[in-house]
Structures are given as structure tokens and as C-alpha cells.
């Protein structure tokens, strides 16, 4: 029997609208019942997020699989926050399932900032060093009792072999369009790179939308739904997906990343990018163009 975890079926997402959120808030948190509710401009996939007044947000999982992260975030984000050099969301309240919404949910403070992008970052090297400093601090938090990789975070922080089947399917679809030989070599190197087995805290989804900027500088890190303790190589993927070449080098130096961890991090970036390229190939939208750009970065 294989010991490699299975990702399972694609989650069946449900929709959530502002009226549902108003009812949940009124029923469970009457002190906030009069506050206006409106969707956040750039919502995520795993959760529907709504402004609750001007200073809070309600965050509601879109599927049962994503709801597994609620208890973890409620338990651990207050532990992590005082040990990190940048603000992270700390829950203000935990909501319960209601008549027309079946999952636990959360209320958080609203953290100001705009999502990071290469165009918005003022100084790419400083941004990379600041991000590395945040991740270094996260890795230093005592992992005793922390959640290991599992269904709550799609096995981030575990073995890359969990994603081998997805990666191979993407490579087959992209054959003849990209340098799949190079991609296969990078993937094999990542799979063969050994982890030292020392559990460290990781974020699990260090990406543009989860890094907030103020005046071009990193000011907050959000969305810890995939966090846990295990192999932190998954957090290295951002070195290729967002950072410049100079920033990538500064990031690696600040974190003192060894060859094996770097190779696995490159593999995490490759998996996500290949899957996106395969899904969007032939499209002219921003997501497709960005995935092709990142694939070039990974191959250099």
C-alpha cells in the first residue's frame, strides 16, 4: 500500500452572499448586527471574505475541505502573531454553522494594504529580505503541538510526491508547447532532494494575494489556511513566482537555504506553475501570461 497521501476529490464549493453573512452576524454576534456587509474586492478561492464595517472582515470557507482550517487558525494564529515581525490576522471571533451555512467561520480585523506584485514592490531586494526575515521568524516558532501536513492544508509541508500525478498530467498536456524535458529534470531533482525531517512552521501559500504592501513595502502577511509544521520548502516557491533574480538570491542568503531545500522549493513552484499553464494554455489573460513567465524563471 502506498504511503503517499491522496488529495481526494475536487472540493464542491458553495456560494455565500452578503445577506447570508448579515444573518449569521445578527444571530451570533448581535453587537455587530448593524454594521454594513460587503464583499472584499479581491476575494479568494478557499474562503468568501466580506467587509464587516470598516475595521473587520468575515471569512467563510467555500467548501467542507477548506473549513478544516478554521479551528487551526483560531488556535494557532494568536500564538504565532506576537512572535512575528509583521502583522498577521488574529481572529476576533469564531462563528458557528447556521441554518443556511454549514461550516465554522471567523471574524478578523481588516489589515490595510494592497496585494503584492512585481510592479508595486518599491525595492525588490529589500522586499525579498523582509519576506525572508518573516519566514525565518516563523520557522523559529516552537512547533510543539502544531498541525502536521494533512487534509486541512492539502499536505503542504509534506512530500512533493503527493503532487506527482498532477504534475505528470500537466507535463503530458504541455508536451510540445514548453521544454518538458527540462521541467521533468527539475521535478525529478525536487523529488529526490531529501528533507532533514526537522519540523518547522510554514505558511503554505506565500503568494501575491497573501502579501500586503504599503508604499511598496511588505507590511503584512495574511491567509494562513494552509499553515502547519513540517518541511518549510513549500514557502520557498515564492522565490520564483514573485521575486526578481536579485531578490531571489537575497532571499536565499537571508534564510540560509541549503541545496536540497532550494530544490524542493523549486519543485513546489514548478508543480503549481505547470498545473496553471496546462489549465490556461492558449488563453491570453493575465493568469496564463504570468504562469508562462514564472515557468521561464523556474527554468533559469
Located regions from the model:
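Short, surface-exposed alpha-helical segments at coil->helix boundaries
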Residues: 18-22, 74, 245, 249
Amino acid at each position: 500500500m502506498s504511503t503517499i497521501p491522496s488529495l481526494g476529490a475536487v472540493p464542491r464549493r458553495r456560494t455565500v452572499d452578503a445577506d447570508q453573512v448579515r444573518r449569521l452576524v445578527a444571530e451570533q454576534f448581535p453587537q455587530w448586527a448593524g454594521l454594513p456587509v460587503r464583499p472584499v474586492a479581491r476575494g479568494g478561492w478557499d474562503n468568501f471574505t466580506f467587509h464587516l464595517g470598516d475595521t473587520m472582515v468575515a471569512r467563510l470557507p467555500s467548501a467542507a475541505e477548506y473549513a478544516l482550517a478554521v479551528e487551526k487558525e483560531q488556535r494557532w494564529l494568536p500564538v504565532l502573531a506576537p512572535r512575528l515581525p509583521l502583522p498577521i490576522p488574529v481572529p476576533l471571533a469564531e462563528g458557528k454553522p447556521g441554518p443556511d451555512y454549514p461550516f465554522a467561520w471567523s471574524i478578523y480585523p481588516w489589515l490595510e494594504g494592497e496585494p503584492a506584485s512585481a510592479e508595486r514592490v518599491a525595492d525588490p531586494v529589500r522586499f525579498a529580505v523582509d519576506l525572508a526575515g518573516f519566514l525565518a521568524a516563523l520557522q523559529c516558532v516552537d512547533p510543539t503541538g502544531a498541525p502536521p501536513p494533512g487534509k486541512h492544508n492539502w499536505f503542504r509541508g509534506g512530500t512533493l510526491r503527493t503532487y506527482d500525478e498532477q504534475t505528470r498530467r500537466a507535463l503530458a498536456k504541455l508536451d510540445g508547447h514548453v521544454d518538458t524535458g527540462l521541467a521533468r529534470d527539475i521535478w525529478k531533482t525536487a523529488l529526490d532532494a531529501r528533507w532533514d525531517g526537522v519540523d518547522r512552521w510554514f505558511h503554505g501559500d506565500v503568494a501575491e494575494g497573501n502579501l500586503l504592501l504599503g508604499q511598496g513595502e511588505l507590511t503584512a502577511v495574511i491567509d494562513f489556511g494552509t499553515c502547519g509544521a513540517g518541511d518549510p520548502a513549500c514557502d520557498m516557491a515564492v522565490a520564483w513566482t514573485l521575486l526578481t533574480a536579485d531578490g531571489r538570491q537575497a532571499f536565499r542568503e537571508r534564510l540560509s537555504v541549503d541545496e536540497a531545500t532550494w530544490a524542493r522549493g523549486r519543485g513546489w513552484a514548478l508543480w503549481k506553475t505547470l498545473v496553471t499553464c496546462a489549465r490556461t494554455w492558449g488563453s491570453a489573460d493575465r493568469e496564463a501570461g504570468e504562469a508562462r513567465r514564472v515557468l521561464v524563471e523556474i527554468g533559469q
